């Protein structure tokens, strides 16, 4: 290659947005023929896994935000003189911010790319944690929580979509489940660190995931499908080549993606009346339905009440018990990550929903029977233990399917030309019902503990029906093949 050719290619690189192209993988593509690619670069699974591990810092931030308010409640209310209602507002503001972030997430990811979207999400997260760390009153505390929620709302849509768009079909399920696995790791870390460090230091530690994410984004390729949709053909093929390995023939996959993009751009403008067509309404219904049912199954209500259940069973340290539940979530989600490309999405969703239904029936029955048993009797103690078993089982079954898979399926089945709008709607619905369950849990539990868990159990039973009748199996299919299923 001549010096002039090198200069020309360098000038072309400078014209392109750095956040979209990165630098190392273009250099690797040019030099691989001269130097020979290393096994690490040549192996597509390693390349894709490295990208997934970097963007997984986003969901870790997501989980850390969710878990932060639990171990810090006593210290924050004491140091800042907050009432219980003021702290409840603090806890719920992340959901409010996430709803706003969810509304914007799809359009941001469509206009500036998946990587640019994650960059935007990281900045308010960092500012939010700093606001909380230096808060002297509720104003900075609330502002920080809102900013965190906004960033998390964008992350919750963008990360599963990015992973689905870069992963090969035989690894997409497992890699897609890393999203929820990272969320549970973030929650567990917040619980664990909250046992040992003050709340202000814990907020400073919350900055780390996004602080590492920002530079990491410059070392991974942009989603090839987004680049293809935007007409950036050279970058699209370079990105895909890096993800599949420099010595892999990507001709077939390139042609499939080009055909899919060409087909979708013919119908680039989608009106609400067009959503009546099966190719749009069916995947939209499935994506929104699963994300709504994920929340209506009551996981947030169960986790919210878990410390009280543990105390009634004689567990002395509710914070330690909460950390134990967080650790169980991580293990169960890791098992799901390993199984999802082997067993399939539908089977895991069905097992998860059936298991959650049975677990919630056990918890509800324990609470109903407690009303007829003396608190001093052995039977009352056994019923308390039974309720703990039911809660733990519910968390395990949720983590096996209904935790990770709705996000995975949403990212897989939404058509390219409505993914931004439809993904925003689905993410907004998930966050809205998360907020609704959190806000109503206390009221429902005050009305009837047994009745509350019965309602959650009925929703989980309906989820079994929903999965059986309407959720398609996406295992082993390319994203382009999935689009053709709905035509």
From Swiss-Prot:
Gene Ontology BP terms: glucose homeostasis; positive regulation of seed germination
Cellular localization per UniProt: Membrane
UniProt entry keywords in alphabetical sequence: Acetylation, Membrane, Sugar transport, Transmembrane, Transmembrane helix, Transport
Residue numbers bearing the N-acetylserine modification: 2
Source domain of life: Eukaryota
Regions that span the bilayer: 46-66, 89-109, 115-135, 146-166, 178-198, 201-221, 284-304, 320-340, 347-367, 389-409, 425-445, 451-471
GO cellular component, one term: plant-type vacuole membrane
Membrane topology category: Multi-pass membrane protein
CDD domains in the record: MFS_GLUT6_8_Class3_like
GO molecular function, one term: sugar transmembrane transporter activity
Function statement: Sugar transporter.
Family: Belongs to the major facilitator superfamily. Sugar transporter (TC 2.A.1.1) family.
Protein name in the entry: Sugar transporter ERD6-like 6
Source organism per UniProt: Arabidopsis thaliana
């Amino acid at each position: 290659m001549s010096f002039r050719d090198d200069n020309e290619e360098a000038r072309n690189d400078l014209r392109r947005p750095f956040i979209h192209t990165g630098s190392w993988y273009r250099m690797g593509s040019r030099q691989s023929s001269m130097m020979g690619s290393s096994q690490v670069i040549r192996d597509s699974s390693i390349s894709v896994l490295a990208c997934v591990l970097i963007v997984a810092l986003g969901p870790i931030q997501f989980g850390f935000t969710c878990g932060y308010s639990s171990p810090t409640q006593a210290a924050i209310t004491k140091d800042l003189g907050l009432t219980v209602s003021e702290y409840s507002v603090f806890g719920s503001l992340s959901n409010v911010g996430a709803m706003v972030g969810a509304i914007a997430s799809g359009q941001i990811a469509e206009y500036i790319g998946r990587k640019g979207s994650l960059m935007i999400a990281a900045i308010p997260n960092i500012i939010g944690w700093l606001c909380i760390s230096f808060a002297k009153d509720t104003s900075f505390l609330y502002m920080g929580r809102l900013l965190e929620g906004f960033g998390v709302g964008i992350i919750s849509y963008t990360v599963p979509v990015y992973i689905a768009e870069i992963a090969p079909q035989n690894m997409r399920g497992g890699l897609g489940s890393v999203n929820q696995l990272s969320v549970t790791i973030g929650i567990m870390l917040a619980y664990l660190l909250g046992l040992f460090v003050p709340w202000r230091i814990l907020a400073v530690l919350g900055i780390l995931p996004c602080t590492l994410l920002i530079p990491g984004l410059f070392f991974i390729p942009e989603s090839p499908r987004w680049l293809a949709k935007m007409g950036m053909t050279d970058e699209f093929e370079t990105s895909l080549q890096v993800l599949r390995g420099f010595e892999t023939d990507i001709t077939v996959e390139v042609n499939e993606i080009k055909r899919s993009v060409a087909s979708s751009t013919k119908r680039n403008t989608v009106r609400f009346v067009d959503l009546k067509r099966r190719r749009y309404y069916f995947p939209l219904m499935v994506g929104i339905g699963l994300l709504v049912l994920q929340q209506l199954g009551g996981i947030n209500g169960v986790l919210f009440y878990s410390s009280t259940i543990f105390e009634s069973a004689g567990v002395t340290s509710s914070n330690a018990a909460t950390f134990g539940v967080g650790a169980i979530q991580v293990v169960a989600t890791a098992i799901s990550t390993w199984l999802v490309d082997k067993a399939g999405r539908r089977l895991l969703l069905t097992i998860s929903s059936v298991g959650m239904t049975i677990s919630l029936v056990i918890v509800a029955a324990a609470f109903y029977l407690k009303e007829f048993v003396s608190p001093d009797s052995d039977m009352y103690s056994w019923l308390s233990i039974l309720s703990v078993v039911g809660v733990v089982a519910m968390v395990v079954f949720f983590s096996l399917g209904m935790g990770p898979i709705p996000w995975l399926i949403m990212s897989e089945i939404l058509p390219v030309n409505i993914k931004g709008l439809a993904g925003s709607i689905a993410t907004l619905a998930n966050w809205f019902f998360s907020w609704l369950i959190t806000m109503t849990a206390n009221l429902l539990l005050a009305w009837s503990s047994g009745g509350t868990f019965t309602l959650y159990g009925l929703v989980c039973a309906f989820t079994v029906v929903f999965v059986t009748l309407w959720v398609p199996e996406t295992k082993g299919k390319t994203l382009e093949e999935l689009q053709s299923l709905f035509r």
